[in-house]
Amino acid sequence: YYLTDIVAIALRQKKKVEAVHVDDVRETLGINSREDLAKMEKNLRDKINQKWMLAGVTLQDPDTTYIEETVRIGQDTVIGPNTHLKGKTVIGERCQIDGTAFLTDMEIGDDVLLKFSVVMTGSRIDRGAIIGPFAHLRPGTHLGSNVHIGNFVEAKAAHVGEGTKANHLTYLGDVTIGRDTNIGAGTIT
């Protein structure tokens, strides 16, 4: 069916047909091809991105920033290019996401720095943490305040205490680590 077919269908079914005013004409566009679908997805992405920029979030390249409607972002957060924010992700205030980030169902506190190329799912990061570059957080991970997870570090169901550092080349799986601990390179838990 085409969107315009709705009028004839409604009349055949003896339904009431009336004109309505829409504030955003993009909401009434039909999708009849893959090209139309891509245009509509861009329209929706632009609308969501505009909402966040008006709320005080900086998007360095809105054309490559993908934010789902369910995401929440704190004021004065800066989001770099090629970032995908999905699901129930909540990002605090004054965070910096350098770019090429894929976040799904994340809870991120204030003043967190996510360096280039991070993948994160179903985890929590407390205030002031620094993550990446090239870090991977898998479900069930909780990073305390001021934790540093460096390059090529992966964590799964890891509970990492405040101030702890795993600077590079480390796997933290199914583990609880106390505060102010330094994890050496090449560590596998």
Question: What is the predicted function of each stretch?
Answer:
Residues Y1-T64, E69-V71, D76:
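Terminal amphipathic alpha-helical/low-complexity segments used for targeting or macromolecular assembly
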Residues T58-T189:
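Structural signal for interior beta-strand "rungs" in well-ordered beta-sheet cores
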